């Protein structure tokens, strides 16, 4: 007969329950979370016309336990977010794009803002910033083509340039003119990074002057230097350009490892996007069995991004009728999948990437109600 366990050796009941519970996730302050989201994809990478970042903010302090991901924030999706107790909605498309003159119950977009604030839910939108990043929507879409290498169609530039200004001016001056010229240049607004270095020009000791300036200041600098022909004829003007960011930008030009038929590509895209149907326009002189080696793609609406690109295939969500005609006339086949169908599938990959980026501090869920408004009847 086994001996009874002394009461003091039994673990307390509350400790047993604690050991059985899943780990409790830490909350994140909204502004801390927004900063982390901006680190994941800088809003500076978004197109200039876009409206990205934190769009709706409940009064602080606001903590986030559940981040809710959706492609489009409709009223049905908002109701789902409320029911699932979301604290922040990340909506790929910005629900506020055109400025609101009032916030009432009259229009559906106004109602989204009202419901968000009533339920203390923030709204954040990354949109074209996620199009540009190397681990973003367009790179996800390339996976539907099969094995390939890709590069941005329109590379992004660095958000800011440390040098300042738009132009660099360089000239050489002798000791007789140097001090007077430098004094006048320093009086010109928007002149940056003025430096001097010893230089030897045609056997004479001179000083090489270098400065950065704005477009407006450039006119004044040139006017000043033109007063002295010796200085002016030794002047060089360079247009400063921001460096390109590797693997970052709008659209992708993909080169497949092996050419495959258009028919096979259609099957791959349908499988990747989990769609029963897509729309196809076969390029002039091509057939469904024609080989595809190069494909240009752009998630969403790709007309402006794809236009003029040499490829065997354009892949996007939607294009205008006339842009499709133009592509087909140039022997380029077109696959259209409807706008958001080329974006929505990325959300599952995004959920996993953000979980790692945010160190699993919060719950991240993907909407089950979000869907493309267009269906094949």
Which positions does each model-derived feature cover?
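Hydrophobic structural segments
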Residues: 2-377
